[in-house]
Amino acid sequence: MGHTQAKSTTDRRVEGGELLLQHLAGRMIPPEFSGPITTAGKFPTIQHVMDHIDSVEELRTLQAGGHWPEGTARRLGLDQPRPTPPPITWTEEEDKKAKEFFKQYQENRPKPAETAPPPITELHAAEPPQWKISPEDPLLKAKALIPVKEPEVPILKVPKLTNKKKMGATFGGILAGLIGLLVGFFLLTKILEILRKLDWWWISLSSPKEKMLCAFQNTGAQTSPHYVGSCPWGCPGFLWTYLRLFIIFLLLLLVAAGLLFLTENKSTIFEKLQWESVSALSSSIYSLLPSEPKSLVALTFGLFLIWTTSSSVTQVLVTLTQLATLSALFFKNSG
């Protein structure tokens, strides 16, 4: 394939002028005309003539403005309506003369007078006015021109309310009494249960399993066969059972009193029982306890609820937790 030469700007202008002339000529000649096309057309009407005059005026306007001169000349049959002027060239002598003239002009050019800038005067900040007023100033002693009247506020006397007995206080006292009775009955039941378990453990250590039946069940009133420690009402062993429970309760009180005595005196015997480990355990439990009394009551009540609805193993764990909590509270109050 051959390479086509790139069109110059002049050629592009010529083509643009021809396209413009064709567009203007299309306005003079109707599109259905199939005869030879000339500048004036064939068999022109008065409308064609007027369009031709308008087109020629537009061409003259474009030619006068210098737009597409070569394309306009080719369309109208003119060779060179405006010959291009020859390019201006400089000879070496003229170039040297121009450079020398410019050099002399720069040397002989008068220099602008250098004027020193005016000195800047130092501006000092004005001293702030003194707004202090002495106590003897007459402005302080002068009275206001407009008298100030205090607004009169009506005083409303509120009648005293008579102290009426509310039903809520009475109901609250009754409810508190019922809750106290419920808690006391619950504690009594749990204490008896713990004492019976200790009694059963004591009897199991002292007698074999074959002799666990009550020995008094055939001596008194006719009762069904039962074990020692669970004697019903009417059996002679009933009193002995509660006597043993009372003795166990006294022993527990004695042990508690001894512990209190040892903790108050901090004797050497209690120190041998690893006082530091016990105090560390109690302090760790105390750090986990809530500080508010309501939270402590809620915690204790929750432990009691777990006790009532759990198995024997869980009851043992809850009992140990309760004892640890009570001991921590005791050490807190004593410390």
Swiss-Prot record:
Post-translational modification, as annotated:
Myristoylation contributes importantly to DHBV infectivity. It is most likely required for an early step of the life cycle involving the entry or uncoating of virus particles.
Q: Which residue ranges does the record annotate as region Pre-S?
A: 2-166
Pfam families according to UniProt: vMSA
GO CC, one annotated term: virion membrane
User: Where are the disulfide bridges?
Assistant: none
> Where in or outside the cell is it found?
Virion membrane
Identify the InterPro entries for this entry: HBV_HBSAG
Q: Which residue positions hold the site described Cleavage?
A: 243-244
Residues where lipid is bound covalently (N-myristoyl glycine): 2
Where do glycans attach? 265
Show the domain comment: The large envelope protein is synthesized with the pre-S region at the cytosolic side of the endoplasmic reticulum and, hence will be within the virion after budding. Therefore the pre-S region is not N-glycosylated. Later a post-translational translocation of N-terminal pre-S and TM1 domains occur in about 50% of proteins at the virion surface. These molecules change their topology by an unknown mechanism, resulting in exposure of pre-S region at virion surface.
**Protein's UniProt name:** Large envelope protein
Organism, scientific name: Heron hepatitis B virus
